[in-house]
A protein has these predicted regions:
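Gly-rich Lys/Arg/Thr-decorated short loops/hinges at beta-loop-alpha junctions or inter-strand turns
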Residues: 34-37, 60-69, 77-94, 202-214
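Long, charged amphipathic helices and adjacent flexible linkers at domain junctions
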Residues: 23-72, 187-199
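C-terminal tails and terminal domains of large nucleic-acid-associated
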Residues: 238-244
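Charge-rich, low-aromatic oligomerization/scaffolding segments with amphipathic character
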Residues: 7-23, 129-132
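Internal, active-site/partner-interface "lid" segment
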Residues: 150-228
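Short, small-residue-biased leader/transition segments that mark boundaries at the very start
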Residues: 3-5
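Conserved structured catalytic cores and adjacent interaction surfaces
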Residues: 32, 76-176, 278
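C-terminal edge-of-domain segments
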Residues: 26-29, 270-286
Length: 286
């Protein structure tokens, strides 16, 4: 997974609501993806290989805490990392694809964040503990863990940040923003199992709503459509559909079309090429 650090250089004000801000960011990303696609594929592969080996050699240098507030955020996948960067990430630390960052990784990232108070957004329930264990290990700045359990929660928390509010006010605003998001995921079974009343075969597609298994055995596109349908209600105004490394652009657009037809015109839907491992789709519904 990758960790991204956001300093306060890009203050997000309350006036920018999740929907409109994310729309702008996603338009920028689409533009970037278009430019990247225009590069010759061979060039791009060579460039990425060089970048990857460069990243492995770099270690984070500690910096003195001069800003008031900063962020460390955890995410996996180039597109998701780009999205967190677009939201103001100054630096990105890479771990392995399915490897959760250690407490040590988080401490290193915190020390490389030039802020007196550093918010940590784990964005995964399995990383919350590692983040909390980092708190007593850093003495020259304060760490506040906002226990985000999913990528959509992390994005929403980040977007509710108010540079004029105190650290404690922000911590509670960010947590409540995170809790107002529904998260859907579509993944695949790593092995045969029985779970939540389902008999699951290795490789089966699994659709989950807020962590609860709901659908087994559809195609990823069909599954994410069912998940979206289950999470939408009459108050839904914004949906972000983030597709992973196993999904083609055609499949992503087909999923978008199905969800758009179901949601109708009143719902703002955005598609993001997240490139994340493990999850075919991550869905944010607000």
């Amino acid at each position: 997974s990758e960790m991204c650090i956001r300093d306060r250089g890009v203050a997000l004000t309350k006036a920018l609501e999740f929907g409109s801000l994310l729309t702008v960011k996603i338009e920028n990303m689409k533009e970037q993806h278009k430019k990247a696609a225009e590069l010759n594929n061979a060039n791009r592969a060579a460039y990425e290989a060089a970048q990857a080996s460069k990243e492995e050699k770099e270690t984070l240098k500690p910096v003195s805490p001069e800003e008031e507030l900063g962020f460390v955020s955890v995410a996996a996948g180039d597109g998701l990392r780009a999205l967190f960067e677009e939201l103001g990430c100054a630096q990105v630390v890479s771990g392995g694809q399915t490897m959760n960052p250690s407490t040590e990784d988080i401490v290193e990232a915190v020390l490389a964040t030039p802020a007196k108070t550093v918010f940590v957004l784990p964005n995964n329930k399995n990383i919350i503990l590692a983040a909390e264990q980092a708190v007593p290990l850093v003495t020259d700045r304060k760490i506040i863990v906002v226990p985000t359990r999913t990528i959509p929660q992390g994005l929403s928390a980040l977007l509710s940040f108010d540079p004029d509010a105190s650290a404690d006010e922000n911590a509670s605003a960010m947590l409540s923003a995170a809790e107002n998001v529904s998260t859907g995921t579509v993944t695949f079974a790593a092995r045969d199992s029985e779970f939540g009343g389902f008999k699951i075969k290795e490789g089966d597609t699994m659709g989950m709503t807020n962590g609860k298994l709901e659908f087994v055995g559809d195609t990823p596109v069909r599954s994410v459509y069912k998940v979206a349908k289950a999470l939408m209600n009459k108050h839904t105004s914004f949906i972000t559909l983030i597709y992973g490394e196993g999904i083609t652009e055609e499949e992503a657009n087909e999923a978008l079309r199905l969800i758009k037809n179901k949601a109708g015109d009143g719902v703002d839907i955005n598609l993001v090429n997240g490139g994340q491992p493990v999850y075919y789709f991550i869905l944010s519904v607000e």
